[in-house]
């Protein structure tokens, strides 16, 4: 199996005829050639020319070049011009496209996104690229053809439910099964925050564009991917007990100042970490309305954290300390709105003929009727996830979220928090609900 190469220059060296001449003119000539070639690597023909001394006869260099790779002339390492991944240590059974997809599943070329790629044969390229079923998230609207109200077999036709009982009624309904912890409406959270709360460094969570548009965008979409957040912790203080991977997993990226971190989703900031502070707990304690926390951990976890006497006392003490940011009057008003009861939440948008309690009952009955059995456990004790239930973005976890209003259930919680459009229908969503299968 091939392996990915990390911490290498952004472009591998291009082979030149070695001339023992250190004059400025010669160096300038080489630099100009190198720059020209790098600028042309969006062309398959140029990429193919870099394989003149490719050492592996059994690995198709044409297919490598066809799918965005060029030869770095360092061992058997190749690099994709479009996603930047470097792959080396190829083995006999390795194939270009599967290995490329394995190490860089979000490559825009493999996902059929719009790029400046210039193929030699566009039809040949189309034949070897992963099919649309493996490329749902990044497919162009023009290449994605499906029925407007289509949904995967066995999943909940949420759009039909929403049309009948209204969006807020669905939000008020909570979780999808009676055995799971209830999930609240995911709304705009407004908090001053920190482990103690960060003064001046925190902006309340707001949705971009305005709430009138109905569409959700994380505050820092560039850090929606966990690996992007992890890269910000290079200068993280090493004496702190909280490790970068723990903070990144909990949705935080490092601001580069002291021990201050921010949540990519709600924009809240935490600082002054104590040795016993656990990132997820602090996130849930101070930023309880954060949609990322709700998706990943659930409302029951948030309520449990808030109920812990020690944490509750710490939060109360921190809020009373001078110099700590406190939510403004406007924030308090919005916070009150987010904690409205189900009856208040649905009073404006639901048809008068459907009472909130009735909507909840209808929703639960539909969910119970369409619930899918829990995946079986094999003899080794590990749970095998059927392929049809895999997240259609990462293909590594079971899908467990529903995008609203389209109702498509195709992504795991972590991936759902990193996109702004439904991966299936490519339409912006206004909300995401955690789904529990019994």
Swiss-Prot record:
Q: Where is the composition biased (Low complexity)?
A: 327-345
Q: What happens after mutating residue 165 to D?
A: Destroys cleavage site
- Any single Gene Ontology cellular-component annotation: nucleus
Q: How is it modified after translation?
A: Ubiquitinated and degraded by HtrA2 in apoptotic cells; proteolytic cleavage at specific sites in the BIR domain linker region generating inactive fragments. Mutation of one site reduces but does not abolish cleavage as another site is selected by the protease.
What are the GO BP annotations of this UniProt entry? antennal morphogenesis; apoptotic process; border follicle cell migration; chaeta development; negative regulation of apoptotic process; negative regulation of compound eye retinal cell programmed cell death; negative regulation of JNK cascade; positive regulation of border follicle cell migration
The yes or no answer to whether the keyword Zinc is present is yes
Q: Which reaction does it catalyse?
A: S-ubiquitinyl-[E2 ubiquitin-conjugating enzyme]-L-cysteine + [acceptor protein]-L-lysine = [E2 ubiquitin-conjugating enzyme]-L-cysteine + N(6)-ubiquitinyl-[acceptor protein]-L-lysine
Q: What class of enzyme is it?
A: transferase
Q: Which UniProt keywords apply?
A: Apoptosis, Metal-binding, Repeat, Transferase, Ubl conjugation, Ubl conjugation pathway, Wnt signaling pathway, Zinc, Zinc-finger
Alphabetical list of InterPro entries matching this protein: BIR_rpt, IAP, Znf_RING, Znf_RING/FYVE/PHD
User: Which Pfam families does the annotation name?
Assistant: BIR (PF00653), zf-C3HC4_3 (PF13920)
Gene3D superfamilies per record: Inhibitor Of Apoptosis Protein (2mihbC-IAP-1), Chain A, Zinc/RING finger domain, C3HC4 (zinc finger)
**Residue ranges of BIR repeats:** 44-110, 226-293
Entry protein name = Death-associated inhibitor of apoptosis 1
Tell me the organism: Drosophila melanogaster
Q: Which gene encodes it?
A: Diap1
